[in-house]
Amino acid sequence: MNGQGDLDAVGNIPKPGEAEGDEIDMINDMSGVNDQDGGRMRRTHRRTAYQTQELENFYMENPHPTEEQRYELGQRLNMGVNQVKNWFQNKRNLEKINNDHLENVTLREEHDRLLATQDQLRSAMLRSLCNICGKATNCGDTEYEVQKLMAENANLEREIDQFNSRYLSHPKQRMVSTSEQAPSSSSNPGINATPVLDFSGGTRTSEKETSIFLNLAITALRELITLGEVDCPFWMIDPIVRSKGVSKIYEKYRSSFNNVTKPPGQIVEASRAKGLVPMTCVTLVKTLMDTGKWVNVFAPIVPVASTHKVLSTGSGGTKSGSLQQIQAEFQVISPLVPKRKVTFIRYCKEIRQGLWVVVDVTPTQNPTLLPYGCSKRLPSGLIIDDLSNGYSQVTWIEQAEYNESHIHQLYQPLIGYGIGLGAKRWLATLQRHCESLSTLSSTNLTEISPGLSAKGATEIVKLAQRMTLNYYRGITSPSVDKWQKIQVENVAQNMSFMIRKNVNEPGELTGIVLSASTSVWLPVNQHTLFAFISHLSFRHEWDILTNDTTMEETIRIQKAKRHGNIISLLKIVNNGMLVLQEIWNDASGAMVVYAPVETNSIELVKRGENSDSVKFLPSGFSIVPDGVNGSYHRGNTGGGCLLTFGLQILVGINPTAALIQGTVKSVETLMAHTIVKIKSALDLQT
């Protein structure tokens, strides 16, 4: 044509090596004239392979270019702006058509599969085959079985009416009311809400209260079982999306269980964990239903608890059906997190042989009616499956509603993500305790530490346990202890001070004991920090007791190998001072607790003498992941951690003397200097 070769639709000569008409756009010419059939004239535009490839590449990056981007693309490819615009429109339409087609094919296949399944089920029903044994059943018996079940149901309803007429004033009406109020939270506050049941007035409980409690407990148990299911839709896979997803999921959860709307300022935390525990199902249930044993097992979390009322001791010689009212305090080892006071009922039920559920729930619908500092315990507890080999499979669920404003900002992510008092910490604490019991009962302790009698090893373990408990209490100050918080001027904001005056108390130094504690954030993960603090080679870099010299281990008792739980008796080389120490590092966090002990006293303990008279003042470190960026749920291999340093010092031998403010300032300086030395040794930003 015209001696110039063929031109493409836009008047461009194709580049060498490119075929003519690689792709054709068919578009409507809005300015064209109608043809004979009344349609619009259609105009074709041929594009080269080069133009098509460039358009495809741009589409992969941005399928919706702006007007400016379309203009620049047209200039670069010698195409009109409308051509570029139409190409992208056509491309998007084509992609949508392909996707719709693929979805239709998939849905059709799924539809055909469901129809086939339906036909199979219909055929099975017509043949009346037993789903278990596959043998034919007698269809004539079906109607009889239905009538029998209806008769049994009617008998049960009569028994319920008789029970309610005996204990409640309006049987049927009252039964409906309690069943509506039974969920962990019910309808709106003040409307058909369960009354706040008095936990403070005596130990007698009316049958009416018992009936209400039992209904609450049964409903909470059903809710816990639902939340424990593997495919339960209320759990988020990744807690990092909590800020975006928890509201929607919480609304779904609340509507499913008829829960009350959260009051303003209240935060809901929920977590779930699953693992093996080296304890039989029955033993674990008995431990949970005995408040004293429960506190002993979960001492790092529960400093104090009491059974207020026993409403039922169970049936058939077991704990199944046992119902109790319990008051307790939960703690995070930090002065920046106040104790969480909880009041709840605990219900235990055997679902089938070897499968037990223990559930807690606070018996009030409105947490604002609880005493100050208390939180509401939503259905929480354990689903325990006995594995018949000395182990149990435990699914732990923790839910709570509390006021976040009482918690320091450093710890709000830790608590909000269910780390500080979440299911994973409870389960790890249980696993560590059970493994310790298993190790100490099955291992010859004299083989662990040569030269130490079995009785002596037992007493050292007992002494270390008392030391660790005293360390906890020196930071969190449970209500049953004698610690008194003091206000000190011109000290660090995160620092807390308490005093305790001891007068001839067994196992306590006589005089005034000062307890100081502080919590700081460090840009290092839990395991790295624990390894540094617990390793004897680095001890002189931060511990003032060593006086810049080394320490050696004279006794070592490994309580729980998998959790790094070790009790040691350390000796400072240059002065012979002995230091008792216990450490662990697991999913619940890490702990290093130590205390200087008098040489003569510890020698008696090593020979098997009672350790109750040994006096000491513990110090130590508590380490937990900071809860930011999901570091806790990825094993805390990255991110930061929260370090709590607690120190107890005898500041006066006269219990009646006044505390000197200068002493407090010296202790503050000592603690600050210790933390600075840790940061410096780890090359952390200060």
Curated annotation (Swiss-Prot):
Annotated keywords: Coiled coil, Developmental protein, DNA-binding, Homeobox, Nucleus, Transcription, Transcription regulation
Localization per record: Nucleus
InterPro entries named in the record: GLABRA2/ANL2/PDF2/ATML1-like, HD, Homeodomain-like_sf, START_lipid-bd_dom
MF (Gene Ontology): DNA binding; DNA-binding transcription factor activity; lipid binding; protein homodimerization activity
Chain intervals for the UniProt region annotation (Disordered): 1-24, 173-202
One GO process term, biological-process aspect: positive regulation of flower development
Family matches, as CDD domains: homeodomain (cd00086), START_ArGLABRA2_like (cd08875)
Domain START, residue spans: 206-439
Residue ranges of coiled coil: 103-170
Compositional bias per record (Polar residues), positions renumbered to this chain: 175-191
Expressed in which tissues: Expressed in siliques, ovules and germinating seeds.
Known role: Probable transcription factor involved in the regulation of time of flowering through the photoperiod flowering pathway. May repress FT.
Similarity remark: Belongs to the HD-ZIP homeobox family. Class IV subfamily.
Extra information: Under epigenetic control. In wild-type plant, FWA is silenced in the sporophyte. The epi-allele fwa mutants (which do not have a change in the nucleotide sequence of FWA) cause a late-flowering phenotype due to ectopic FWA expression in sporophytic tissues. Repression of FWA is dependent on histone H3 'Lys-4' methylation and cytosine methylation which are partly controlled by the lysine-specific demthylase 1 (LSD1) homologs, LDL1 and LDL2.
Summary of subunit composition and partner proteins: Interacts with FT.
Protein name listed in UniProt: Homeobox-leucine zipper protein HDG6
